[in-house]
């Protein structure tokens, strides 16, 4: 009985480790999509190469240790319209899977504080959004 419990605990811990490891094919697909959907124009992913439009728009950078970190966002006053209307209301969010997907699907719903709203909704499938998520998440490097 003890052996069975230990085996179940070991299997569970191995599954957790595997879940944290990114799928390399999905990351590669996300990288291609990041380029073909021109995300790189606004979102910097290389510390040595600034994103041209991103500097002016103060767009989110995907460099360094950013995943799982908190950020302030301003809420849209009228989420039913496709145009961002500043509400003056701010909320703290964590850059995680849920917030990333929401930002890609509804970019005007919550805009990072001090950023200029301008990201158009991307015509993407659910699978493409998962690939973009995997790529962006893979870029976050914890500080040593």
Identify the residue ranges that each predicted region occupies.
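Hydrophobic h-region of N-terminal signal peptides that target proteins for export
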Residues: 8-18
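Short, cysteine/histidine-rich loop/knuckle motifs that typically chelate Zn2+
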Residues: 41
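Short pre-active-site segment immediately N-terminal to redox-active cysteine/selenocysteine motifs
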Residues: 35-38, 46
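C-terminal capping alpha-helices of c-type cytochrome domains
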Residues: 98-105, 109-110, 117-144
């Amino acid at each position: 009985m003890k052996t069975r419990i230990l085996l179940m605990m070991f299997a569970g811990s191995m599954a957790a480790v595997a879940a944290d490891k990114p799928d390399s094919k999905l990351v590669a697909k996300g990288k291609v999509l990041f380029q073909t959907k021109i995300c790189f124009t606004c979102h910097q992913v290389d510390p040595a190469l600034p994103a041209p439009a991103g500097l002016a728009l103060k767009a989110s950078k995907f460099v360094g240790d950013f995943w799982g970190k908190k950020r302030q966002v301003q809420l849209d006053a009228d989420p039913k319209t496709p145009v961002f209307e500043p509400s003056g209301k701010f909320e703290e969010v964590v850059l995680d899977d849920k917030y990333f997907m929401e930002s890609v699907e509804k970019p005007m719903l919550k805009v990072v504080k001090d950023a200029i709203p301008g990201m158009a909704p991307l015509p993407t499938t659910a699978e493409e959004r998962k690939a973009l998520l995997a790529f962006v998440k893979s870029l976050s490097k914890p500080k040593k």
